[in-house]
UniProtKB/Swiss-Prot annotation:
<dbReference type="GO" id="GO:0004822">
    <property type="term" value="F:isoleucine-tRNA ligase activity"/>
</dbReference>
<dbReference type="InterPro" id="IPR010663">
    <property type="entry name" value="Znf_FPG/IleRS"/>
</dbReference>
<comment type="function">
    <text>Catalyzes the attachment of isoleucine to tRNA(Ile). As IleRS can inadvertently accommodate and process structurally similar amino acids such as valine, to avoid such errors it has two additional distinct tRNA(Ile)-dependent editing activities. One activity is designated as 'pretransfer' editing and involves the hydrolysis of activated Val-AMP. The other activity is designated 'posttransfer' editing and involves deacylation of mischarged Val-tRNA(Ile).</text>
</comment>
<dbReference type="InterPro" id="IPR014729">
    <property type="entry name" value="Rossmann-like_a/b/a_fold"/>
</dbReference>
<dbReference type="Pfam" id="PF06827">
    <property type="entry name" value="zf-FPG_IleRS"/>
</dbReference>
<dbReference type="Pfam" id="PF08264">
    <property type="entry name" value="Anticodon_1"/>
</dbReference>
<dbReference type="InterPro" id="IPR013155">
    <property type="entry name" value="M/V/L/I-tRNA-synth_anticd-bd"/>
</dbReference>
<feature type="short sequence motif" description="'KMSKS' region">
    <location>
        <begin position="602"/>
        <end position="606"/>
    </location>
</feature>
<feature type="binding site">
    <location>
        <position position="921"/>
    </location>
    <ligand>
        <name>Zn(2+)</name>
    </ligand>
</feature>
<dbReference type="InterPro" id="IPR033708">
    <property type="entry name" value="Anticodon_Ile_BEm"/>
</dbReference>
<feature type="binding site">
    <location>
        <position position="924"/>
    </location>
    <ligand>
        <name>Zn(2+)</name>
    </ligand>
</feature>
<dbReference type="InterPro" id="IPR009080">
    <property type="entry name" value="tRNAsynth_Ia_anticodon-bd"/>
</dbReference>
<dbReference type="GO" id="GO:0005524">
    <property type="term" value="F:ATP binding"/>
</dbReference>
<dbReference type="InterPro" id="IPR001412">
    <property type="entry name" value="aa-tRNA-synth_I_CS"/>
</dbReference>
<keyword id="KW-0007">Acetylation</keyword>
<dbReference type="GO" id="GO:0005829">
    <property type="term" value="C:cytosol"/>
</dbReference>
<dbReference type="GO" id="GO:0008270">
    <property type="term" value="F:zinc ion binding"/>
</dbReference>
């Protein structure tokens, strides 16, 4: 028996079946680094229109977690897809390097500044620590396959960036947005510092809730207001609070102007409450016998005075819109030094912003004899006892509620009025302009717009000062007596910035005021405060984007971070850019959800459900992680677990197998010599290229819309359905058995080549390592890297005007599906083994019949059977299977007649008809020894 195997064009490629990504990727990365791939891309894209995705700086502390990976991979997919779309899209990664978490780490090791080390040495240790953290995170980000200028990232602690942060503040001062004031800010007594809103978390806490009576100073005036005379005992206005410790700072009682307030007679006294809350208050304080003597609107009680229960002064009733009927009494204890609403209304009424609490959370001397020096959280019981002693306590109970806590210490924080510096939201129209700018930005998903609008509309002035050691100094001089800023503040700040640019922030603390103030130095003091770390990152549009040469003066097109950054980086960047330049720092803002486990639970070390990106990369490879990110809808929570990653690995295998099939069947194909012109190609091959063209249109549209899960779904459909279960199956016969250099085979290879050129580019932004690997095996002259090129433009398709157009092949796909069902049933019934053992008769109505007949003898190749006949629908025998999909089709199956050809495996009547090749069929004889078969359609 002759060996005809050598006459077959069997697939062959060095591209491995298994990805072995965890082992192979590091080698690819080494090559990317050695070649300076990022530099090669920049050179290739020079002069193209720019797309700038500005990196929100992660905090330089700790290892990267799965959320970091999601963020960096999404950014990388966008940057790479923009590159393929013809943009120059430089990516400069950054890190946030100042701030409290780093200080705390250094404190843990070396003690607080001034203990073992001077403040200057402490800052040097902080800088050193941040640098080691940056190095650790950088290695992991690079391992993810993220391309960027990793050798020259921006760090907020770079001397030049520190100087530019000071300049940004100078510009804001110049535009009139800064003011100083004693104002209640979130204050952590453990940090001994003000906290930004983004540094506050909420946890459940048990507090004492109390109802307290403030007795009226002028009882007769109140009786007159309520038009009553028969009141038994003193009249009091009752407040309700969950922070008894703030009562020493009480300076007023807020009531709502439009609510009805009732004068209620109870045993031995009368109390004033919101009418709608009388019943609930009476239940709470345990009073069943009460009488409503009269009612008035809150506005009637404005400026009547009430005696503080133990502080020895009286306070006014004032009108406030923040009073609600949700809980309490309808009268709100108001301490302007301990709450933002209280502060705002206090300013309106000219109240003192009293703050009796020191930075460590204890009452200052002279507050009240039994409270001086006591920690406020331990003072509640003392205050309650005082109220009881004075007869002012109506009720006390414990209640569980959500309470603001320090994000770092997880301990409760307080509002505390301190002298701070603020960026004003309203004194120069910053709020109004910011709201206007928001409307000009594209928010992805679009609900982000309403979210940030509501935050900007309702946010207080931004407290930008901190009392910390490791941070950018505010670099201000204030007059010793008046505390006014120096008249030459902007000039002085630029002088400081120049020094910081050379020596870093330490230059400010080393600066002797005489050096730049001369004789005025005796009248001015240096402001010791540092800037809120959110000011550092929020000013990078100016301190980084505006000055990096690769951005060439272009503003950022996109900011992309987790959805918590509406209140964080997106907000601080918007505030600073609008205050400096009058415009938003970005054109598009994309947010992604948080990662959760397979059951939708938040990731937590204590539950043990965290997924380590390092582990995933070491076991499965970065491309699997990247594919999971891309295939997950980032607009909601992003679920990840071993099972979910396993599914991503399965999808990856399907894509890889498709790529491998293409490469293996391009064996011996040289596009420069072997390409077949479209008009000479087999129709099915042109259809396949057209499928790729349609897929590319969908995929590019999805990349453009940042719908990466759509990209993956379309890619999978193309690989699994259009190629895997139809086209690639059909062409195996022609590809393997036709003459090696025949038009029939070269047509097929031409299609595979076009498809591979397109596919490798679709993959590149997501499966970057695998695309690079595929690229290396593609035939023909090409650039060294897929990332320097653009989307493939060599695709074409069938014209609608052709008889065998896309609609024709869509119908054929359905026919093939129906035939497959019949074959599967026959296999289950043991009537046939493989599909080539079958011959089918298609009983079709005239329109479909004409289409099927048009394929002639090539219909069997489309159906993967050894025989295929078309007959009249009405002639179908009773056992023919009626199609559920195509009403005008019935399918009958019989065993194929003839012998099996050992070369092509088809059953035919002409095996052995040619004496020189007695074992094979006539078609194979033609392909081995003759001119080769001609294929026109399939």
């Amino acid at each position: 028996m002759s060996d005809y195997k050598s006459t077959l064009n069997l697939p062959e490629t060095g591209f491995p079946m298994r990805g072995d990504l965890a082992k192979r990727e590091p080698g690819m990365l080494a090559r990317w680094t050695d070649d300076d791939l990022y530099g090669i891309i920049r050179a290739a894209k020079k002069g193209k229109k720019t797309f700038i995705l500005h990196d929100g700086p992660p905090y330089a502390n700790g290892s990267i977690h799965i959320g970091h990976s999601v963020n960096k991979i999404l950014k990388d997919i966008i940057v790479k897809s923009k590159g393929l779309s013809g943009y120059d899209s430089p990516y400069v990664p950054g890190w946030d390097c100042h701030g409290l978490p780093i200080e705390l780490k250094v404190e843990q090791e070396y003690g607080k500044p001034g203990e073992k080390f001077t403040a200057a040495e402490f800052r040097a240790k902080c800088r050193e620590y941040a640098a080691t953290q940056v190095d650790g995170q950088r290695k992991d980000f690079i391992r993810l396959g993220v391309l960027g200028d990793w050798s020259h990232p921006y760090l907020t602690m770079d001397f030049k960036t520190e100087a530019n942060i000071i300049r940004a503040l100078g510009k804001i001062i110049g535009n009139g947005h800064l003011h100083k004031g004693a104002k209640p800010v979130h204050w952590c007594v453990d940090c001994r510092s003000a906290l930004a809103e983004a540094e506050v978390e909420y946890y459940d806490k048990t507090s004492l809730s109390i109802d307290v009576a403030f007795q009226a100073v002028d009882q007769d005036a109140l009786k007159a207001k309520f038009a009553v005379s028969n009141v038994n005992g003193p009249i009091s206005l009752v407040i309700w609070t969950t922070t008894p410790w703030t009562l020493p700072a009480n300076r007023a009682i807020s009531i709502a102007p439009d609510f009805d307030y009732a004068l209620v007679q109870i045993d031995g006294q009368a109390v004033i409450l919101a009418k709608d809350l009388v019943e609930s208050v009476m239940q709470r304080i345990g009073v069943t016998d009460y009488t409503i003597l009269g009612t008035v609107k809150g506005a009637e009680l404005e400026l009547l005075r009430f005696t503080h229960p133990f502080m020895g002064f009286d306070v006014p009733a004032i009108l406030g819109d923040h009073v609600t009927l949700d809980a309490g009494t309808g009268a709100v204890h108001t301490a302007p030094g301990h709450g933002p609403d209280d502060y705002v209304i206090g300013q309106k009424y000219g109240l003192e912003t009293a703050n009796p609490v020191g930075p460590d959370g204890t009452y200052l001397p002279g507050t009240y004899p039994t409270l001086d020096g006591v920690n406020v959280f331990k003072a509640n019981d003392i205050v309650v006892a005082l109220l009881q002693e004075k007869g002012a306590l109506l009720h006390v109970e414990k209640m569980q509620h959500s309470y603001p806590c320090c994000w770092r210490h997880k301990t409760p924080i307080i509002f505390r009025a301190t002298p701070q510096w603020f960026v004003s939201m309203d004194q120069k129209g910053l709020r109004a302009q910011s709201l206007k700018e928001i409307k000009g930005v594209q928010w992805i998903p679009d609900w982000g717009q309403a979210r940030i609008e509501s935050m900007v509309a309702n946010r207080p002035d931004w407290c930008i000062s901190r009392q910390r050691t490791w941070g950018v100094p505010m670099s201000l001089f204030v007059h010793k007596d008046t505390e006014e800023l120096h008249p030459r503040t902007l000039e002085l700040m630029e002088e400081v910035a120049k020094r910081v640019e050379v020596d870093g922030i330490q230059a400010w603390w080393d600066l002797d005021a005489k050096e730049i103030l001369g004789d005025e130095a005796d009248q001015y003091v240096k402001v010791p405060d540092t800037l809120d770390v959110w000011f550092d990152s929020g000013s990078t549009h100016s301190s980084v984007v505006d000055v990096r040469p690769e951005f060439a003066g272009h503003a950022a097109d996109m900011y992309l971070e987790g959805s918590d950054q509406h209140r964080g980086w997106f907000m601080s960047s918007l505030m600073i850019s609008t205050a400096m330049k009058g415009k938003a720092p970005y054109r598009q803002v994309l947010t992604h959800g948080f990662t959760v486990d397979g059951q939708g639970r938040k990731m937590s070390k204590s539950i043990g459900n965290t997924v380590s990106p390092q582990d995933v990369m070491n076991k499965l490879g970065a491309d699997i992680l990247r594919l999971w990110v891309a295939s997950t809808d980032y607009t909601g929570e992003m679920a990840v677990s071993d099972e979910i990653l396993k599914r991503a690995a399965d999808s990856y295998r399907r894509i890889r197998n498709t790529a491998r099939f293409l490469l293996a069947n391009l064996n011996g194909f040289d596009p420069a010599k072997d390409m077949v012109k479209p008009e000479e190609m087999v129709v099915l091959d042109r259809w396949a290229v057209g499928c790729a063209k349609a897929a590319q249109e969908d995929i590019l549209k999805a990349y453009e819309a940042y719908d990466f899960h759509e990209v993956v779904q379309r890619l999978m459909r193309f690989c699994s359905v259009e190629m895997g279960s139809f086209y690639l199956d059909i062409i195996k016969d022609r590809q393997y058995t036709a003459k090696a250099d025949s038009v029939a085979r070269r047509s097929c290879q031409t299609a595979l080549y076009h498809i591979a050129e397109a596919l490798v580019r679709w993959m590149a932004p997501i499966l970057s390592f695998t695309a690079d690997e595929v690229w290396g095996y593609l035939p023909g002259e090409r650039e060294k890297y897929v990332f320097t090129g653009e989307w493939y433009e060599g695709l074409f398709g069938l014209a609608d005007s052709e008889a065998m157009n896309d609609a024709f092949w869509d119908e054929l796909l359905k026919v093939r599906g129906e035939v497959n069902k019949v074959i599967e049933q026959a296999r289950a019934d043991k009537k046939v083994g493989g599909s080539l053992e079958a011959a089918v008769t298609l009983y079709a109505e005239p329109e479909l019949s004409a289409k099927l007949t048009a394929l002639g003898d090539e219909l069997r190749f489309v159906l993967l059977t050894s025989g295929a006949t078309v007959a009249d629908y009405n002639d179908a025998p009773a056992d023919a299977q009626q199609s559920e999909v195509l009403k005008g089709l019935k399918v009958a199956l019989s065993k194929a007649e003839g012998e099996k050809c050992p070369r092509c495996w088809h059953y035919t009547q002409d095996v052995g008809k040619v004496a020189e090749h007695a074992e094979i069929c006539g078609r194979c004889v033609s392909n081995v020894a003759g001119d080769g078969e001609k294929r026109k359609f399939a």
